[in-house]
Amino acid sequence: MKDHPLPLAPAVAASLAEWHRMIAERDLAALSALLHPDAVFRSPVAHKPYPGASAVAMILSNVIEVFEGFTYHRQFASADGMNVVLEFSARVGERELKGVDLIRFDEQGRIVDFEVMIRPASALAALGEAMGRRLAAGGR
C-alpha cells in the first residue's frame, strides 16, 4: 500500500503505523497494546458487537490466519483525525472478497471501535464458516 499522508492525530498516526506493521508481518502479538480495555468489535456476520479488548484481540488474531492474500488498498480519515477507513481485499478458500475496516481511536491512539464490512455475501458466508471452524477448534 502506498503511503498517503492522512490528517491524523499524532497518537492515531503512530497506532495506525503499528497496525500496518503487524498486518504486513501477519503477527498481532502486540495488538493488546493498541486496544482500549473497553474496545468493541463489530462483526460483519453477527448482529451483536463483541465487547472488550480480549474479544477484539481474539477475533482479529484469528481472522488474519483465515484470510489469504490480505492486502490494504486505500485509506481515508475523518476530519478530526480520530477515525480511519481501510479498504482491503483477501481470499477465503476460493472466495475473493473486498471489505473495509472502520476504526475509531481515542486520544491516546488506542482502538475503541473496530467495525468490518465485507462483500460479496458468498465470501462473507465462507469467512463465517472458516472462523466458526477455527474458533471451535480452539483458535488462539
Model-derived segments and spans:
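Short N-terminal micro-motifs specific to bacterial/archaeal maturation
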Residues: 6, 22, 46-47, 102
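Short, mixed-charge, low-aromatic patches
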Residues: 10-20, 43-44, 56-60, 86-88
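Short, low-complexity N-terminal intrinsically disordered segments enriched in polar/charged residues
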Residues: 1-33, 37, 135-140
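A solvent-exposed, acidic/Ser-Thr-rich amphipathic alpha-helical stretch
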Residues: 28-30, 34-81
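Small-side-chain structural scaffolding
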Residues: 22-25, 30, 39, 85, ...
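A beta-strand edge to alpha-helix "cap/lid" segment located at domain peripheries
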Residues: 2-7, 58-140
